[in-house]
Regions:
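Residues within helix-turn-helix
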Residues: 1
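Hydrophobic Walker B segment
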Residues: 4-7, 39
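Catalytic metal- and UDP-sugar-binding loop of GT-A-like glycosyltransferases, i.e.
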Residues: 12-13, 82
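Non-catalytic connector elements of ABC transporters
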Residues: 43-47, 53-160
């Protein structure tokens, strides 16, 4: 956080290796690797393994989460990243829900809503103010405003 606010350029390293060098905006908006994506930003980026369904639509196995990536040629598993600040929760029926609200962390100007999406996976959405949903509510996750960050499952490198 401090480096993001004070620096013109940042070097992100892992295990003695340079992962990415760039401006705070470049590193936050276009992380070069999955490591950088998970390291920069609070709360951390939601990162999941996903597999292709049809024409750019991917699903996180064992969960109700499906994401349109607009990558029709995708045929293999990938890692997908979604920033909590770009995702929102919406009340839903049990049948239509992607998950259930597990925890709400009210932090004043915003609240972190932690959703159990099944398969042992948790999804964090950052809502402004105090959310209308409650713990135990069934919800869908609105990804309309979310930038989709796609990483190679083997190398961790950004795709596209």
């Amino acid at each position: 956080e401090e480096a993001m606010s004070l620096s013109h350029k940042i070097a992100v390293m892992s295990r003695g290796r340079l992962e990415q060098y760039g401006s705070p905006e470049e590193i936050y908006s276009r992380p070069a690797t999955e490591f950088v994506a998970g390291f920069v930003g609070k709360p951390r980026m939601n990162l999941f393994t996903a597999e292709p369904l049809e024409r750019g639509l991917v699903a996180v196995p064992g969960t109700g989460l499906k994401v349109d990536l607009e990558l029709p040629e995708l045929r293999e598993k990938i890692r997908i990243g979604l920033r909590p600040s770009e995702c929102h929760v919406v009340s839903a029926s049990e049948e239509a829900a992607a998950g259930r609200v597990a925890v709400i962390e009210p932090l004043g100007a915003y609240s972190d809503v932690i959703v159990d999406i099944g398969g042992g996976e948790l999804f964090v959405a950052r809502e402004s103010g105090f959310p209308e949903v409650r713990v135990g509510d069934h919800v869908t996750i609105d990804l309309r405003d979310a930038v989709r960050h796609v990483f190679d499952i083997e190398t961790g490198l950004r795709r596209g």
